[in-house]
Amino acid sequence: VQFYPAKQESMFCFSSGTSGLPKAVRLTHMNLIANTIQMTVTLGGRVNKPTYDLYGWYDQPAAPLLEGIDQVHYSLLPQFHCYGMITSIINLHTLTPAIIEAKFSPESFFRAVQKFRVTFAFVVPPILIALVRSPMADKYDLSSIKSLASGAAFLSKELCTICLLYTSP
C-alpha cells in the first residue's frame, strides 16, 4: 500500500453551511499539518517538544516551549466542524489547555474568561457580534485575553477594530 500524505484523506469534517447546506469537507494529512503549523506560528510558535521539527516542517531551528500554564484557549466550535477539529489538534500540538463549552452565551464566555484566565479564543463572526453587543462585558475581567482567531465566515473591518479594543497586548 502506497501512502501519499499530501493527497491521502485523513478525515471528513463538515462545513457550517454559510453558503447553503453543510457539506462534507475532505481533509488530507497535509491539510491538517499545514493548518496546525499556520496556527502554531500565529500563536507565537509555542509547540510540543516531542513533535517539534521532527520532519523539518518549521524554518526556525528552535521555538519557545510552554513555561507553565500561562496560555488557556476557549473554544465552543463543534468538533465535527473543520474549524473545531483543527482547533482541537492545535491545542494538542501546543500542549495548551482548552475550555470547551457545548453551548454558547456571552455570559458563559465572559465567566470562563474571568475564571480560567483565557488568553486566546477560537470564534466565528456571529459569536464576536454577540460578544461586542453584550452589556455583560463590562461586568467581567477580560484582561487576560491576548488575541482572538476568527474563521468560517467574513469578518468585517469594523468588527475586527472593535475586537482589538478587548484584547490586551
Language-model segments: which ranges?
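Conserved AMP-binding A3 loop
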Residues: F3, S10-V41, R46-L54
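Adenylate-forming
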Residues: L77, F104-E107, V118-I162
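Short beta-strand->loop structural element characteristic of the AMP-binding/adenylate-forming
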Residues: V1, K23-R26, S75, P97-K103
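Conserved small/polar residues in nucleotide/adenosyl-binding loops
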Residues: S15, Y166-P169
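Conserved G/P- and acidic residue-centered "switch" motifs that form tight phosphate/ATP-binding loops
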Residues: T18, L95, A152
